[in-house]
């Protein structure tokens, strides 16, 4: 399970250090793709295969299903860590997520997300103001 928030910098070659805490969970090969909210989703290969199968089951006759499949899968790239624990992010993903220099890498259960620091800070500020309302509407932890 991935959790936590880490701030790093993108180097001039489009590489970013993956937090040591996430490296083992991602494994040797993993997949990065366009995520929701203009961030990059990074999945360990086993999680990617589960997600890919679910996408494959979407009805081909539905235009929204085709659009989602195209968006999600066409942006996907198989990645690996270099010896320094960095991931080289393809330019199409860096452009999509508006990654410049400062990035935030967060753990979200079965995936890692990579955000531009500016977008993450804005998102977090908005989310904090509505967190309690969202929790009341969708979450029932029976606590």
Curated annotation (Swiss-Prot):
One of its GO terms (cellular component) is cytoplasm. Keywords: Cytoplasm, DNA-binding, Repeat, Transcription, Transcription regulation. Its main location: cytoplasm. The keyword Cytoplasm applies. The keyword DNA-binding applies. SUPFAM superfamilies: AbrB/MazE/MraZ-like (SSF89447). Forms oligomers. Belongs to the MraZ family. This is Transcriptional regulator MraZ. It comes from Natranaerobius thermophilus (strain ATCC BAA-1301 / DSM 18059 / JW/NM-WN-LF).
């Amino acid at each position: 399970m991935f959790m936590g928030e880490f701030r790093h910098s993108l180097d001039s070659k489009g590489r970013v250090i993956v937090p040591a805490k996430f490296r083992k969970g991602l494994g040797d090969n993993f997949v990065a793709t366009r995520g929701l909210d203009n961030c990059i989703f990074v999945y360990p290969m086993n999680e990617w295969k589960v997600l890919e199968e679910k996408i494959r089951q979407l009805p081909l006759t539905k235009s929204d299903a085709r659009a989602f499949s195209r968006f999600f899968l066409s942006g996907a790239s198989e990645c690996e860590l270099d010896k320094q624990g960095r991931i080289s992010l393809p330019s199409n993903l860096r452009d999509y997520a508006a990654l410049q220099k400062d990035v935030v890498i967060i753990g979200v259960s079965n995936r890692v997300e990579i955000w531009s620091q500016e977008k993450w800070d804005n998102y977090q500020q908005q989310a904090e103001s509505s967190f309690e309302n969202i929790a009341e509407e969708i979450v029932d932890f029976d606590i």
